[in-house]
């Protein structure tokens, strides 16, 4: 399956709290147990708690996406053979790109063979990367007092990570690269 632009997915800034309302979701794109997925050449704005949640996906390519969101950009969980290339992700209130190896599939599964290259990760105000104003006026996330917007490995992880490559990425106004044992 391929989703290719140009175009904009506008999630209207839904939060995890609002997702409890009938008919309301908190993910712009959610993929589970899929193979051979390509996402390329489009933009995503204010996409809720997850712009992209990929769980148990094999052979996933994310190419040249521009994501400007209020919470997580890309959550890659229990996935194999993933390429994230040439993406710009602004996520001041949460992680830009996070790799997990959780128990979401009902069994342990490593996240492996992941390459993140030529990406730009920032924590500017929501919506200001896509409109190129790069503002810094917004109050911080409601659940912590700092800008996040980083690449992270470790949240909710009880499985392992194998063959992870992060190369030629730029981190600006964010918390950089995090290797953490959190929630797992």
Label every model-predicted segment.
Residues 1-184:
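Extracellular/periplasmic carbohydrate-active domains that bind, remodel
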């Amino acid at each position: 399956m391929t989703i290719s632009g140009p175009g904009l997915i506008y999630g209207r800034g839904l939060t995890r709290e609002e997702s409890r309302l009938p008919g309301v979701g908190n993910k712009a794109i959610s993929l589970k147990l899929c193979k051979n997925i390509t996402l390329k050449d489009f933009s995503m704005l204010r996409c809720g708690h997850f712009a992209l949640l990929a769980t148990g996906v094999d052979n996933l390519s994310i190419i040249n996406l521009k994501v400007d969101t209020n919470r997580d950009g890309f959550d890659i969980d229990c996935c194999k053979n993933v390429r994230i290339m040439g993406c710009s992700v602004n996520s001041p209130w949460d992680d830009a790109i996070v790799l997990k190896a959780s128990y979401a599939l009902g069994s342990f599964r490593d996240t492996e063979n992941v390459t993140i290259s030529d990406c730009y990760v920032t924590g500017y105000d929501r919506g200001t990367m896509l409109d190129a104003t790069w503002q810094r006026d917004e109050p911080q996330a409601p659940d912590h007092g700092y800008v996040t917007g980083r690449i992270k490995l470790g949240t909710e992880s009880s499985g392992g990570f194998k063959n992870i490559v992060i190369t030629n990425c730029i981190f600006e106004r964010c918390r950089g690269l995090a290797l953490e044992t959190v929630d797992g």
